[in-house]
């Protein structure tokens, strides 16, 4: 069937300082076990800057570690705390739970949490950062300046902890991840159907072929939960600093970091830390690191320098997912986070409601999790154009007619219809997406129409304003 979505005001102008970006919470409903052995279905919303677990009908939950139960939350000043009432699915609630829920306003609680999340994100966003001019894409709307055309050197460090190591069947994590990142047509029993290099080569129409260098594993001296510890619901920045510094110092014994300063500006363009265990975005491990992309010299105290170059941006994601913990996770989170490195922003909703966003159609939204992260969708026409991978074919209103819209993945073609009088800041993009190749697990197929309204004020607040 034809599947059509219209996104209005979705993409905000990205002309401000680079943001700290994070993977979205896995919003798919999942069952979690209560202390008495029963199960409740929950959903998680948000990102690194703020997230909340809820019932499927929207009531915020609090996990009480002392009882081992998810309990209905109540608001205490600015934070959630337990009401003491054990949560259950709507059809299984007792009278006490039903009466309690009549007395609370989940909308009011979520509104307060959204304000806090926005404030935290704003602090991360506006600190000054190092920025340099690099060749490649036109950089117009991107939040970073990493080369998106050619074959830049990319450093990936495998990182494990004193109590959490990589769990590969053959005992060779380095060999496994070299294959996952670089082997053409990579397959594995977790459902993998292509390598990271395959993904970016396809999405860029052959214009971007990064040289992935995988090293490690290096083992940090402290525990998994130490580095993933939270403060006010977010990863502690001092522990993240130890995580990055420790990993880079350990890797410096075998790595020449100057190789990864692709333009010679004195900064490593990016260090990717692939860490053992789980991440907080798609699991219930609260004391684990949430996958994210930060700038080290922006958010950490002091600089970090090796081989005459400083560590600039870094990115990280986990080995395992909370959905299938017995197998290595797919490439979806890496492709999402590395797309931040290239300069793309998050396109998922930053609030705790059911805002209409690209969802599974976009790797910068919930497409990260398609086919359990094994088959992220290729980048949209808009994203490709911003990265220098696609040139729009312009249509003139009232003058041009099209009868065939070529499939995006196969043709790398899309149409643009400018809105008169907006000086190129507002336009429609038409693309044809079919459920083949990397797009096999899209929720639908046919034409996607994107209404791009580039607004710096919207981006400043990190909001997706969607009108249908």
Where are these regions (language model features)?
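Conserved small/polar residues in nucleotide/adenosyl-binding loops
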Residues: 466-468
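Active-site-proximal segments of metallohydrolase catalytic domains
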Residues: 135-148, 191-307
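Fold-level signature of zinc-dependent metallopeptidase catalytic domains
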Residues: 130-180, 230-237, 277
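N-terminal prosegments of processed precursors
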Residues: 21-143, 393, 397, 420
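Extracellular hydrolytic enzyme modules, especially secreted metalloproteases
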Residues: 203, 270-442, 450-457
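Bacterial N-terminal signal peptides
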Residues: 9-17
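Bacterial N-terminal signal peptides that target proteins for export
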Residues: 1-7
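Active-site-surrounding "flap" and adjacent substrate/cofactor-binding loops of secreted or lumenal enzymes
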Residues: 165-166, 170-205
């Amino acid at each position: 069937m034809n599947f059509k979505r219209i996104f209005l005001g979705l993409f905000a102008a990205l002309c401000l300082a680079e943001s700290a970006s994070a993977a979205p919470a896995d919003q798919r409903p999942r069952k979690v076990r209560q202390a008495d052995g029963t199960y409740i279905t929950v959903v998680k919303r948000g990102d690194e800057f703020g997230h909340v677990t809820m019932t499927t009908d929207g009531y915020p939950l609090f996990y009480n570690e002392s009882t081992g139960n998810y309990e209905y939350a109540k608001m205490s000043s600015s934070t959630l705390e337990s009401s003491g009432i054990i949560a259950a699915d709507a059809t299984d609630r007792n009278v006490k739970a039903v009466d309690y829920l009549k007395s609370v306003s989940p909308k009011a609680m979520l509104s307060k949490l959204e304000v806090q999340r926005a404030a935290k994100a704003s602090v991360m966003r506006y600190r000054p950062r190092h920025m340099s001019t690099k060749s490649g894409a036109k950089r117009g709307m991107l939040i970073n300046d990493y080369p998106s055309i050619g074959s830049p050197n990319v450093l990936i460090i495998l990182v494990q902890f004193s109590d959490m190591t990589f769990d590969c069947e053959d005992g060779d994590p380095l060999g496994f991840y070299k294959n996952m990142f670089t082997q053409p047509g990579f397959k594995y029993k977790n459902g993998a159907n292509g390598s990271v290099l395959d993904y970016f080569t396809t999405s860029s129409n052959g214009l971007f072929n990064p040289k992935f260098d995988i090293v490690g594993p290096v083992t940090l001296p402290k525990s998994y939960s130490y580095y993933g510890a939270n403060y006010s619901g977010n990863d502690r920045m001092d522990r993240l600093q130890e995580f990055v510094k420790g990993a880079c110092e350990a890797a410096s014994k075998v790595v020449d970091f100057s190789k990864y300063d692709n333009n010679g500006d004195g900064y490593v363009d990016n260090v990717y830390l692939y860490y053992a265990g789980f991440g907080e975005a798609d699991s219930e491990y609260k004391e684990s690191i949430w996958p994210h992309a930060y700038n080290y010299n922006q958010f950490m105290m002091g600089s970090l320098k090796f081989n005459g170059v400083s560590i600039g941006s870094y990115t990280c994601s986990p080995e395992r997912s909370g959905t299938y913990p017995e197998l290595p996770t797919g490439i979806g989170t890496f492709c999402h986070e590395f797309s931040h490195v290239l300069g793309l922003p998050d396109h998922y909703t930053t609030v705790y409601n059911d805002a209409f966003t690209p969802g599974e159609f976009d790797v910068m939204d919930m497409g990260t999790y398609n086919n359990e992260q094994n088959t992220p969708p290729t980048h949209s026409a808009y994203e490709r154009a911003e990265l220098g991978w696609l040139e729009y074919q312009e249509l003139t209103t009232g003058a041009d007619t099209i009868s065939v819209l070529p499939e995006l993945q196969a043709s790398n073609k899309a149409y643009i219809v400018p809105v008169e009088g907006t000086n190129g800041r507002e336009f429609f993009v038409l693309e044809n997406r079919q459920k083949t190749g990397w797009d096999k697990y899209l929720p639908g197929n046919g034409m996607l129409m994107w209404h791009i309204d580039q607004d710096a004020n919207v981006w400043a607040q990190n909001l997706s304003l969607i009108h249908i």
